[in-house]
Amino acid sequence: MATKAAFARMNGLGNQIIVADMRGRADSITSAAAIRLASDSETAFDQIMAIHDPRTPGTDYYIAIINCDGTQAQACGNGTRCVVQALAAETGRHAFTFETRAGILTATEHDDGLISVDMGTPRFDWQDIPLAQAVADTRKIELQVGPADAPVLHSPSIASMGNPHAVFWVDKDVWSYELDKFGPLLENHPIFPERANISIAHVTSSDTIDLRTWERGAGLTRACGSAACAAAVSAARTGRTGRKVTVNVPGGPLLIEWRDDDHVMMTGPAEWEFSGTFDPATGEWSRDTQGLQGSGNADRGTA
């Protein structure tokens, strides 16, 4: 019988995260276990960040990312910050190199407790996102919600931050739109063969963006780090902002910088809530005070 694994329930600006310690184990977290944890109000999460032993020389750990519907994700910026805080508290280190399905990334915890993650380089070619058909310019593609002569949302910018994103630009409060209604339809639109994260963005100044996101495989979220990065680079790419912006998500602000070397840096907080142990096969769990330690609802709910 497999031993239980330690976990920490955390959040990154309200994005609910479970950081699971799978180091030194040959097993993985099953979809059934993830779905069971997601269905429990105490352990409900947007993503599980499962820390495994490294697979590639030069990296510290491999991070498997699991959505609340049991599917695998390529990237999760808020979850990565939670992993860094948990590991920094455990090891005393403040800089880490991780491997994920999206590639290798680095992250650093600063003296003020904020954590910066190098989210890598954005991709804009339609094949890399991917889209189901050729698109000459992903700064603005033909996709809309509502009547042809009066669409509610239209002409999103498309980008990949290791996972596909569509950013719809609006000129009024992002809360004016029924993202809970449009999100699942757009996530599963045929143009996105791997589904997509769907965001509504309002540029309020040359260095500020308000953002709400329907997260692929998770639904409405109070924060999505990769979506904030996708919105920031898309805003700069379309001339709406400069390359360093504050992205205000429902959970709070993220600082995003699209550096001259093409890498996107995301800086924000992480928060530890409680720890416990769980069975990676079944999802049965219990709360305790041991294990990984760091220092719910829809996107408008409390963190």
Swiss-Prot record:
It comes from the Bacteria. The keyword Isomerase applies. PROSITE patterns: DAP_EPIMERASE. It is found in: Cytoplasm. It catalyses: (2S,6S)-2,6-diaminopimelate = meso-2,6-diaminopimelate. Residues 279-303 are annotated as: Disordered. Pathway: Amino-acid biosynthesis; L-lysine biosynthesis via DAP pathway; DL-2,6-diaminopimelate from LL-2,6-diaminopimelate: step 1/1. The active site is at 76 (proton donor), 224 (proton acceptor). Catalyzes the stereoinversion of LL-2,6-diaminopimelate (L,L-DAP) to meso-diaminopimelate (meso-DAP), a precursor of L-lysine and an essential component of the bacterial peptidoglycan. This is Diaminopimelate epimerase.
